Regions:
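Composition- and surface-driven signal marking solvent-exposed, interaction-prone regions
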Residues: 161, 448, 663-666, 714-716
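A broad, structural surface signal
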Residues: 31, 35, 84-91, 173, ...
Length: 736
C-alpha cells in the first residue's frame, strides 16, 4: 500500500506529491488528511508531510520508494472535503499546495491535554453513611468534610477538595484504602467563553425578519442552496435573523460557522451567542493560546459544539455536519488574507458551502459592490431589512461639516463648532459618544521644519509615526526609536509632528472636556489578550463618557447609551491609490454613523470633511446604499474594474531592487507577448510602499474580460514564479 504525500516545505520545485510505502504496521491506519513523518532528500531527513491519497500501485520502481515513518496527527475527519477545498484554493489563489493545506488542515500543535482529577464515591450508601458516623465520632475532620461534600454532589474536583475544603492527603488516602472513594481523571477543555453571562431573552422577530427566516428555512428544506445576501440598514436586527436560523439548524442536527471580520467583535458576538446557546458555542481567533485553540478544534471534531464563531480562520473548523456558514459584515477587507495563499474568505466560504451542501448567508448594511452586483443579477438571493429592530429607534440625524469653512472662520481646532456643541450637550445629558479617527498614534508624521524631510523608517519607505512617550514607531514593521532632538539629515532642532492620531485626539478631548471620562481603543491599547474586552466592557457599563478610536470601534458594536458619533476626518481613506477607496470610505462612514441612536434616544452624527460634495460622503450621510451602489457601479463599468472585469495584482519582492524590477518586467513581457489583445496590463511600477521590511516591491495589474485567458495568464505567472524563486525573488498574485 502506498501514500501520495505533499512535503511540508514551501518551495515551487517541491510543489507535488511524493509516493511513500506504508509499513505493514500502519496499513489501515494511514488515511488521507493525516500529517505524517517521512524520510526526505538524500540524507533522509525526517520531514512532516500531508497524506493526499492512497493507492496500491507504485508510480516508479518499488525498490526506490521510501517507507513512511509514523503518523503524527490522526485527524482525517472531513478529509476529502477539506483536501478538495485546499486544492481549489491552490488553483484559485496560487502559492504552493502545501501552503493551502496548512491553512485548511493545520497540523495539531504538540499540546498536552488538560486533565482534571476528581473524587467519586465507590461504596453503597449505607456503608458510606456508617463510616461517616464513625468519622464524626472519631473527630476525623478532613474525612468528614470530604464525605459530607460527596453526599451533596456526584463528584468533587481534587483542586476544590484540597484548596477550598482544606482536605489533607492522609485523609484522602484513608478513604481510598477503605474503598469509600476513588480518584478519577477526565479530559478538561480549556474554556474560552465568558465567565459570566446574563441570559439573553429570545427576541420576537418583526414582520420583515420573520419573513426572511421563513423563506430561508423553507427554501433550505426544498434543497435550495443558492447563496443569500441579507442587506439591512444598521441596527435592523441582522443578528437576530442569524440567531433564529442557527436555532433551526441545531434542531436539524446541523453545525454552523459564524464569521466576523474583527477580533474586537468576537467578545460581543460570543457574549450574545453564549447567552442564547450556552455550551453549544465556542470561538477561535489568533489571541487564543495553542492549548485553547487546540481544545476548541478538538471539541468541534468530537461534535461537542454546534457553533463556531471567529474571524476568517474559523471557516476551517473541522465540522462533520455543516449546514450553515454566516459571513457577517461580508464587505470587510479583513476577510482578505495577507498571507499566502491570499484567499478571500467570502469566495472560499462559497466553495466550502458548495462542497458540504451548506447554505452561505452573507450579511451587511453596506454590501461589497461584488456581492450586491451578484444579488442584482440573480447569482445571489437578496433579502432586505429596511427598518431598525428596536421599537421607536430610527436612523440618526447626520450633519456634514465643511472643514474648509471652519478654517476660514478662524477655527483651527480638529473639532468643528457643531461637533463641540453636540459634545457639550451630550455630556450635560449624561449620554455617551464615540469619536472616530482612523489613524493610531499621536502625529502621523514628524518632519523637519528647516529641510522639510520627514523622519523615515530605515527598513520601509514610510514615515515614522509619533507616539506618546517621545517615541517614533513604524506601523508596518514595528521598528521603534526615541524621538531625536535634531533632524538626522540637516541637524536642525526644529522638528514638528503633523497630522492627527488617536493619542493626540484623546489628549485634545481631555484638554477641552477635563471632567469627561475618556477611553481610547486602537492597536496600542488592545495589544494584550483581553484588551478589546476590557475596553468594550468598561464602555458598556458606562464607566466612560467618550470612546475614541480607530475603525475597530465602529464595526458591529451595539451601545444603546451612545447618542453622538463624531467622525473627525472623513477624507482619510478617500484618496488612496485603490479603485475601492470610495467604497471603503462609504462603508466606514455608514458603519460609524450606525453606532448612534441604537437605543430609545435619538442619535446625531457629525461628519467632518474637506470634500463634502463627494458622492461617497453624501450618500453615507443619507444612509443611502443603493444610490452609492448605482454611482459606483457606473464608474466600475466605465473603467472595467471588478465586478465588471477580472483583475489581479502581481507583485515581485526581493532583497535586491534590481531583481524585483527585472522579474516584474519579465511578467509584463511574457503576458503581453501571449495575450497582447486580450489582457490589459497597468504598470509595472513601484508598489505604494516600495520597500517594506527591507524587501523591494514592484507591481503591475492585470485586467481582462476573458475568463479563459485570465486563467491561462495565472498559469503562466505560476511558471514564472518557479523560475524567479531560483534567484530568491517571490512573485505574489492578489485577486482584486
Amino acid at each position: 500500500m502506498y501514500a501520495d504525500i505533499v512535503i511540508d516545505i514551501s518551495h515551487e520545485s517541491l510543489d507535488r506529491p511524493f509516493q511513500y510505502r506504508i509499513p505493514e504496521s500502519l496499513v489501515g491506519q494511514v488515511q488521507p488528511g493525516m500529517w505524517v513523518l517521512v524520510p526526505f532528500g538524500r540524507r533522509n531527513t525526517q520531514k512532516k508531510g500531508f497524506v493526499l491519497k492512497l493507492g496500491t500501485k507504485a508510480n516508479i520502481d518499488p525498490d526506490r520508494i521510501k517507507e513512511l515513518t509514523e503518523i503524527i496527527s490522526d485527524d482525517n475527519s472531513s478529509d476529502k472535503i477539506r483536501i478538495a477545498l485546499a486544492v481549489w484554493m491552490y488553483r484559485e489563489y496560487g502559492g504552493n499546495l502545501i501552503q493551502s493545506l496548512r491553512v485548511v488542515m493545520p497540523a495539531r500543535k504538540n499540546v498536552r491535554p488538560k486533565q482534571v482529577s476528581f473524587f467519586v464515591r465507590t461504596s453503597d450508601e449505607k456503608r458510606f453513611l456508617d463510616y461517616l458516623d464513625l468519622a464524626r465520632k472519631k473527630n476525623w475532620k478532613g474525612r468528614v468534610r470530604l464525605m459530607e461534600a460527596l453526599l451533596c454532589r456526584d463528584y468533587i474536583s481534587s483542586a476544590f477538595a484540597r484548596q477550598q475544603l482544606k482536605i489533607a492527603s492522609d485523609a484522602i488516602k484513608a478513604l481510598e484504602e477503605e474503598k469509600l472513594i476513588q480518584i478519577e481523571t477526565k479530559r478538561f477543555y480549556r474554556s474560552v467563553l465568558p465567565k459570566e453571562s446574563a441570559s439573553l431573552e429570545k427576541k420576537q422577530l418583526n414582520e420583515e425578519q420573520q419573513a426572511i427566516v421563513d423563506k430561508l428555512i423553507s427554501s433550505y428544506q426544498a434543497g435550495v442552496r443558492t447563496p443569500a445576501l441579507l442587506y439591512g440598514i444598521t441596527g435592523s436586527g441582522k443578528t437576530e435573523v442569524y440567531m433564529h436560523l442557527i436555532e433551526w439548524m441545531i434542531r436539524q442536527n446541523k453545525q454552523v460557522i459564524v464569521l466576523i471580520p474583527e477580533i474586537s467583535l468576537t467578545y460581543q458576538v460570543i457574549l450574545n451567542f453564549y447567552s442564547r446557546f450556552g455550551e453549544q458555542v465556542s470561538m477561535i481567533n489568533s489571541r487564543l493560546s495553542d492549548g485553547e485553540r487546540s481544545d476548541q478544534l478538538e471539541r468541534a471534531r468530537n461534535g461537542e459544539i454546534s457553533i463556531m464563531v471567529g474571524p476568517r480562520s474559523a471557516l476551517f473548523t473541522p465540522f462533520s455536519n455543516l449546514g450553515l456558514i454566516i459571513v457577517d459584515e461580508e464587505q470587510e477587507g479583513a476577510y482578505n488574507s495577507e498571507q499566502i495563499p491570499r484567499y478571500h474568505t467570502r469566495e472560499t466560504a462559497g466553495k466550502l458551502a458548495q462542497l458540504t451542501n451548506s447554505l452561505l448567508l452573507l450579511g451587511s448594511a453596506t454590501p461589497s459592490i461584488e456581492s450586491f452586483s451578484r444579488a442584482e443579477s440573480g447569482e445571489y438571493r437578496k433579502f432586505c431589512l429596511t427598518k431598525r429592530a428596536v421599537l421607536g429607534s430610527c436612523l440618526p440625524n447626520v450633519q456634514v461639516v465643511d472643514m474648509r469653512k471652519e478654517l476660514e472662520s478662524g477655527n483651527r481646532s480638529v473639532f468643528s463648532r457643531e461637533l463641540r456643541e453636540k459634545m457639550e450637550e451630550c455630556l450635560a445629558k449624561k449620554q455617551q459618544m464615540m469619536l472616530f479617527i482612523n489613524r493610531r498614534g499621536f502625529s502621523r508624521v514628524v518632519s523637519c521644519r528647516s529641510c522639510g524631510k520627514p523622519i523615515e523608517c530605515p527598513h520601509c519607505d514610510v514615515a515614522l509615526t509619533e507616539h506618546l512617550g517621545d517615541k517614533l514607531v513604524c506601523h508596518y514593521c514595528g521598528y521603534t526609536k526615541a524621538m531625536p532632538r535634531s533632524c538626522p539629515l540637516c541637524g536642525s532642532p526644529y522638528l514638528a509632528g503633523f497630522g492627527l492620531g488617536t493619542q493626540k485626539a484623546e489628549m485634545m478631548i481631555k484638554a477641552q472636556f477635563p471632567s469627561a471620562r475618556v477611553l481610547r481603543m486602537d492597536m496600542d491599547t488592545t495589544s494584550k489578550k483581553d484588551g478589546h474586552e476590557q475596553i468594550l466592557d468598561s464602555f458598556r457599563r458606562r464607566e466612560a463618557d467618550i470612546l475614541v478610536g480607530t475603525q475597530m470601534i465602529v464595526k458591529g458594536h451595539d451601545f444603546p447609551g451612545v447618542t453622538l458619533v463624531g467622525i473627525l476626518a472623513a477624507d482619510m481613506s478617500l484618496y488612496n491609490c485603490d479603485f475601492r477607496s470610495s467604497e471603503r470610505t462609504f462603508q466606514l462612514l455608514t458603519q460609524a454613523a450606525g453606532r448612534a441612536g441604537r437605543g430609545m434616544e435619538p442619535g446625531n452624527v457629525i461628519i467632518q470633511t474637506y470634500d463634502p460634495e463627494n458622492y461617497s460622503i453624501q450618500t453615507a450621510a443619507n444612509q443611502d446604499y443603493e444610490s452609492f451602489y448605482h454611482q459606483e457601479i457606473r464608474f466600475r463599468r466605465r473603467m472595467q474594474y471588478p465586478p465588471i472585469g477580472l483583475m489581479c495584482e502581481v507583485m515581485a519582492v526581493s532583497a535586491e531592487e534590481k531583481l524585483a524590477n527585472q522579474w516584474i518586467w519579465q511578467v509584463q513581457l511574457l503576458i503581453n507577448k501571449r495575450f497582447c489583445d486580450i489582457i490589459k496590463i497597468i504598470g509595472p511600477s513601484d508598489a505604494p510602499i516600495a520597500r517594506l521590511k527591507d524587501m523591494w516591491r514592484k507591481h503591475l495589474y492585470i485586467r481582462s474580460n476573458d475568463h479563459k485567458a485570465y486563467l491561462e495568464a495565472m498559469e503562466l505567472i505560476q511558471e514564472i514564479t518557479e523560475q524567479a524563486a531560483v534567484q530568491k525573488v517571490s512573485i505574489f498574485v492578489t485577486v482584486c
